[in-house]
Amino acid sequence: MKFLPGLLFGALLIAAPVAAAERLPAVLHVHSTLSTGQLSLDELATLAEQGGIGALLLSENYLLRVEYGLPPFRALTRVTYTERSVLASGIDEYLRRVEEVRRRFPRVLVLPGVEVMPYYRWSGSPLRFDMTASDTQKNLLVFGINDPHVLRALPAIGNPYTGRYTWQSVLDAAPAVLIVPGTVLLAVKRRRRQRLGRAVVVVQRRSWFAGAVLCTIGVVALGRAWPFTSEPYPPYENLGLTAHQDLIDAVERAGGVTVWSFPEAQDSGARKVGLVNVSWETAPYADDLLRTFRYTAFGGVYENATRFERPGDGWDRLLREYATNERRVPAWAVGESGFHEFSAGKRFGTLQTVFLVNARSEAAVLDAFRHGRMYALHRTAKEALELGAFTVSAGAATASSGDTLMAPPGTPIEAAVAIDASDGGAHEVRVALVRDGAVVEAWSGVTPFRARHRATFDGRPSFFRVDARGPSPHRLLTNPIFVKP
């Protein structure tokens, strides 16, 4: 339609629910020294407090363990690579440390979360001196679970708390049986006749070498295979997205939230393990978001160039499926930081998820998370775009991000957008209003920006969202508002 000056719809926008809610800037996906980060929890909380950040959503690595074993005795022959993670060092200790930093920094909400690697798979062979571990970064972030018993039992490859007994358990335990004949050889003296000239002497000897070898193999097998449970998600098979969906469902049952992490980022590397070249790789996997269900959100804005959230692409397909009741849970977009340390130009706090809350509490943040009351933000250290309001109205009814507006066919509807700048200044901004995967309005102006779009609801389930951009890297991506008959 057309761009409208700032005060034209001031009364409407101030009355909208978005304006009434408090903006709580948060840094989502942060690692500390408890896992793979380089800053302590206190240092991170200090940065947040100094930067005006209201919440830290920690994503400590849940379990960083990759292993390979030769068949059939995989436990006996396995080689393992591990890095620091909270499951290995103790879930109770992790939650205790978070509680301590909360007491020291009451002005910053610190939410404990984990980054889970649900599954990886091996290809290649050590016999060919070349192996690849795939999908080691196809990860999910988990928040909202503070029960240590539940957190310990998350479905994830390598989790010792979720093992089960299978035929592989029998194979792994089999070499331990060698302790029995080994012990017999060490304990029992064997009689031998030995001729000395014309005389025959009976000599009693134990089989020290053979007995020691058998006992050593048995003891090593016992230690490596104990408690003889097998991996529910063996990395030697292609299980697709089974483990990822199991994790999503387990978290949903526990009342938590899940986030697909960096779906369009690529990760690869290689190192020598003895004579074997071992590489790892994770290709962009945005299409997998269309193949999984019931997760809460995905990383929609981060440092990589992305396509999934573009008009008409994967995100709009997901939203269309939700609007038409093909999905029970919509997929919200978040700003994802992935902060480990200050390196390679990495900054703290420039990628944010801004929650729209009615109270500054962990419960309010998680409630906003589940219901899509937040927007993704890429900013600089000095200034940022701010969502003054984003609403869709039908008569006296008004909905904001994450809401569903009910309206009969033929009802006039109006989408209202307000974009401000954190410093109150006039900054160039381009704003796209997306409806059902297509850009229905594209405006250019300066902050404070106000605009509206009018249409008549035709009765088909619909959704609206806003993508606003300023000079690079400034960007603000809202979550959708649904309209249904």
Model region roles, listed by residue range:
Residues 5-15:
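Bacterial N-terminal signal peptides
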Residues 20-485:
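Extended, charged catalytic domains and RNA/DNA-binding interfaces, predominantly
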